Amino acid sequence: MSTVTKLLLPLALAAAISACSKPADTAAPADTTAAAPAEAAAAQAAPEVAPIQVASGTYKLDPTHTDVLVQWTHMGFSNPSAHFGNVDGTLVYDAADVTKSSVEVTLPLSGLNAFTAKFDEHLRSADFFDAAKFPTATFKSTKVEAAGTNKLTVTGDLTVKGTTKPVTLDVTINGAGEHPMLKLPSVGFDATTTLKRSDFGVGAYAPAVSDEVKVRITTEASIPKAE
């Protein structure tokens, strides 16, 4: 065997071994396009929210479990809130034709609470609500419409400090049925809206204190026993 052959033989063997041990080309990624329709079908097959059945009748709001919370921005630093308690109101609900439903609510300003006595006094002063002259705020619906499953849109007249303006509430029905404690037909709602203080003559210190206020309402109401 020549010297050249002796030198090339180990190289040839190494090349052969390398070729045998080289892994097969990586398999092409699986086609995932078929999974997309399957996922979409699964999403469409998700159960829909069941409609809550609210009994027709005249409901009385429960002030213990009714809260009207308002929130604003203070000089860009904080988002304080206040709430109206001792709310009095009546809801007439027509299950056959929700557009025939109505609601009337009275908010006594004596129930206004910003969690600080001095601030409560300021809010009730002539700078804001002037509660001595205007002791209550009221809301009276003018239109009730279905807005999807367990959703309503309630439009009405809000009167604050002698000024009346139209307001629209986005309402969610939380639940309905016999109240486990009261044993009465009952219903619970949440509602939200956004107002401008200046529309009702309580726009003091705007815009440092935001003119817009967010309103969140939660309530329970029951049909009283017949007397």
Positions of predicted regions on the chain:
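Sec-dependent bacterial lipoprotein signal peptides
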Residues: M1-S18
